Every structure is written in structure tokens, then in C-alpha cells.
Amino acid sequence: MSLTRHEIREKAFQALFALNANPDADENQLFQQLLNPEETDAVEIPAYLSTLVTGVREHQVELDAQIQPYLSQKWSLDRLAKTDLIILRIAFFELQFVDDVPTKVAVNEAIELTKAFSDDRSRKFVSGVLGKVVKNQAN
């Protein structure tokens, strides 16, 4: 089973969403359920899936601190939809810690995740936040 990076990001989002609800869940078992729902033989977990999920979890406090300044004064991380926050964490992680993912790709993939797992308002919100990030990086 060979997954594209886009599919891996979708699985990473699903894993992080599940781990948000149950932080003590076993990551590897969760990966197996996401990758092989029929529970036949164990499948090899793509390295990039593990990198994203483990990285976002390990750097969550740092990522949240980086996201907060891009929110309007009326918003805090606690007010964000969990889907939006998880997608932003993945994007910020890729932007900061994954060298072989161009900024444009990280932003586009975050918007695609929002289209798949959230609504149009969330897509506009995530796009706006990441647009500010890109503008800041250019300056």
C-alpha cells in the first residue's frame, strides 16, 4: 500500500483528531486502524505519517504559540474548531520543521484538508491565517 503525501496528510489529520479526543491512545494501533480498517495483516506505517503525527504532538505547545499571533484579538486557540486547529498545526509543522515541503505546498495541502474535513468558512479562515504567514515570511 503506497500512499501519496496528500493521502498521508489526510491520515495524519485523522490520527491527530482521534488523539485529541483520546491522548493516551496507542499511535501505532491507531495508524493500523486508519491504514488497514479490515484488520487483516499489519501494514507498514509510512515514515512521513509518523513524522507528522509525532512531530505535531511533540511541538504542539510551540506550534500553538506560533499560531496565536495570526488570530484576531477576538479569537483564542480554545475558540477554534478542533478541525481548523489541527490543520493549522500540521501546516505550521510542515512550514517550520519539514525542509522538503515548499511553503506553497504546505499552504495548499492545508486548504485541501480543510475542504475535505471542514466547511467553507473554515477554509476561508485557514486560508487567511496561512496567507498572513506567507506574507510575513516574504518580508
Curated annotation (Swiss-Prot):
The keyword Transcription applies. Keywords: RNA-binding, Transcription, Transcription antitermination, Transcription regulation. One of its GO terms (molecular function) is RNA binding. Coiled coil: none annotated. NCBIfam families: nusB (TIGR01951), PRK00202.1-1 (NF001223). Belongs to the NusB family. Involved in transcription antitermination. Required for transcription of ribosomal RNA (rRNA) genes. Binds specifically to the boxA antiterminator sequence of the ribosomal RNA (rrn) operons. GO terms for cellular component: cytosol. The keyword Acetylation does not apply. It comes from Lactiplantibacillus plantarum (strain ATCC BAA-793 / NCIMB 8826 / WCFS1). This is Transcription antitermination protein NusB. It comes from the Bacteria. GO terms for biological process: DNA-templated transcription termination; transcription antitermination. HAMAP family: NusB (MF_00073). InterPro entries: NusB-like_sf (IPR035926), NusB_fam (IPR011605), NusB_RsmB_TIM44 (IPR006027).
